[in-house]
Amino acid sequence: VTNSKYSFELMMTIASRTDVSDFYKNHKDEFEIIKNSVIEEYKNSEICYNLTEYSYSHSDEKIQKAISGVLEDQKEYIYCELTHIKFKGEFLYFYTPNETRYIVFSTQNKKPEMPLYGDKIIYCHVLRKGWYYCESE
């Protein structure tokens, strides 16, 4: 578990109030701490499996299929080998090592502007107590 100082809520607040480049330039050390905290918190696969289980019970077949398809045999790769984070507006982007897959966390029930590069995307809308909706496109 990460220090609450570097919680998702804090990152969402930062992401919603700052420009990406300005934030990175002015907060490089803090950026690294946040990134490492997230990686530390999710380096075990619990969240990966929880999300997979959620997808199987989701009532929307299209979303269920999309999530399970993306996560099949790749849960740890997607969630446990995240290498860096990018902020843009109110959205928080996690990129996987080769940057072909990324995960978007948002505190708002909406999607970021498209297009964004990457062949797979998972939108994860985050509430205070955790995940409540994810969609892959």
Where on the chain are the PLM-derived regions?
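Extracytosolic and intramembrane catalytic regions of membrane-associated proteins
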Residues: 42-137
